[in-house]
């Protein structure tokens, strides 16, 4: 019944190695309400943490969904006769590996955008985030609104 955390087994200075391996160093993301020791402790006890490392984010499913949704900006480019054309922008520093329905997986790089078209009759669409884990094989599926 512990909070999720990320770490390494490196025994020494790692500052000069960041970026060389192609991955960011592991980090524990703590969602504290304030910048105080008490607030950090409360967040840890409430298990409001995510582990980030080697291109993956792990944690409780709802927190993963909220984190991903907060990282995305959805813009309607134009509305056609049958489809709505959207831009989804990743406003975070994390590359996301996404899958929509039966389509191929795609990578959405940090601070980059991709285009989607959706039937005009829908107001939401689902993306499964393949580099987020809520269990060994569990990836959250997030509903985005436009």
Language model features by range: what are they?
Residues 1-146:
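Charged catalytic cores and adjacent phosphate/nucleic-acid-binding surfaces used
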């Amino acid at each position: 019944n512990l909070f999720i955390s990320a770490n390494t087994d490196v025994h020494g200075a790692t500052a000069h190695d960041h970026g060389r391996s192609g991955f960011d160093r592991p980090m524990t993301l703590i969602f504290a309400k304030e910048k105080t020791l008490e607030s950090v402790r409360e967040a840890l006890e409430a298990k409001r943490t995510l582990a980030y490392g080697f291109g993956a984010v792990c944690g409780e499913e709802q927190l993963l969904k909220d984190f991903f949704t907060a990282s995305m900006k959805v813009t309607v480019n134009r509305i056609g006769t049958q489809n709505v054309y959207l831009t989804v922008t990743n406003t975070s520093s994390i590359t996301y590996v996404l899958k929509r329905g039966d389509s191929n997986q795609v990578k959405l790089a940090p601070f980059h955008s991709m285009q989607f078209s959706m039937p005009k009759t829908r107001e939401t669409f689902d993306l499964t985030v393949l580099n987020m884990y809520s269990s060994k094989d569990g990836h959250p599926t997030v509903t985005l609104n436009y």
